[in-house]
Design a protein with these regions (language model features):
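Structural signal for interior beta-strand "rungs" in well-ordered beta-sheet cores
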Residues: 48-228, 232-233
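Terminal amphipathic alpha-helical/low-complexity segments used for targeting or macromolecular assembly
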Residues: 5-8, 17-18, 22-52, 57-58, ...
């Protein structure tokens, strides 16, 4: 399963956007809330929409949402239960937003891609539950017809971060201020992106990896590793981060030995993988590391 691919996306991958949304809302007690010029489709439950907010009649808003002053919720936006928009937030569609997401002032989410070959085809953005989008964060939709940008759940995107078209971001990640993803980047679960990190298009960052501030990422960052520098280099395993997530000491030793074989020997990647398989016991972390480095179109950072 791809990192960040939401349950909604997996369940409705064979449907077009409109039918998928209709299927998602089946059986739910939807009503039409007519408040002046606001005729957004809303659940028959209390919510707070500021009088200066502009809500498209084609937006769908679930209960418990709070939409602050001068926010804009556009056509094709589905806003899940309990979402909070501070003020001057812009949500554009087609975009599906899950539950309990927070959008701080001047976040712009769901705008069309900045890819110059985009020709106004219908593309999508899907966001999971419990994410935080701080001030001036931008997230773009996909580029090709039917393409999606996917963001998982429980992520924290600090001020001025950017997620470009067709990216896939997993769960429980932290992007420090001004972290930037170019198009088609994949970020797996539990990644920490240092402030001002810039990631080249089509790169991948493996789970539990971390990048230092101002890092320039032009190839894949293997899982469990720390990358730092311009251009970035692998500095070792993310020992402190892995300990905080409860990794056993034995597993840390195995990952450290795998790092030594990959980065402190004269072996190429294929030879290093063979040696890791021969010398170290099977475990899920090493299997994921091996799969990641052997399926790396751009190659891994050395």
């Amino acid at each position: 399963m791809k990192a960040g691919r939401s349950a909604f996306s997996r369940r409705h991958s064979g449907r077009n956007f409109a039918s998928a949304v209709a299927f998602y809302f089946r059986g739910k007690d939807l009503g039409i809330a007519h408040e002046g010029e606001n005729s957004a489709i809303c659940l028959k439950t209390s919510m707070s929409i500021h009088s200066t907010a502009i809500i498209s009649p084609n937006a769908q808003i679930f209960p418990g949402c709070e939409i602050g002053p001068y926010c804009v919720v556009g056509d094709g936006v589905v806003l899940g239960e309990g979402c909070w928009l501070q003020h001057h937030v812009s949500l554009s569609g087609p975009t599906i937003v899950g539950k309990w997401n927070q959008f701080f002032s001047f976040a712009s989410v769901g705008q069309r891609t900045q890819d110059l070959k985009y020709a106004a085809e219908p593309t999508h953005l899907e966001i999971g539950d419990g994410n935080t989008f701080r001030e001036f964060v931008t997230v773009n939709r996909g580029t090709s017809p039917g393409a999606k940008t996917l963001v998982g759940s429980r992520n924290h995107f600090l001020a001025y971060c950017h997620i470009a078209h067709d990216c896939v971001v997993g769960n429980d990640v932290i992007f420090s201020n001004n972290g930037t993803l170019a198009g088609h980047v994949t970020v797996e679960d539990h990644v920490i992106l240092g402030g001002f990190t810039a990631v080249h298009q089509f790169c991948r960052i493996g789970k539990f990896a971390m990048t230092g501030g101002c890092s320039k990422i032009v190839q894949d960052v293997p899982p469990f590793m720390i990358a730092d520098g311009n251009p970035a280099r692998i500095r070792g395993i993310n020992k402190v981060g892995l300990e905080r997530h409860g990794f056993a000491a034995e597993n840390l030793r195995h990952l450290k030995e795998a790092y030594r074989i990959l980065y402190r020997s004269d072996l190429n990647v294929g030879q290093a993988v063979e040696q890791i398989r021969a010398e170290l016991p099977d475990n899920p972390e090493l299997e994921h590391l091996i799969e990641f480095v052997t399926r790396s179109p751009r190659g891994i950072i050395k």
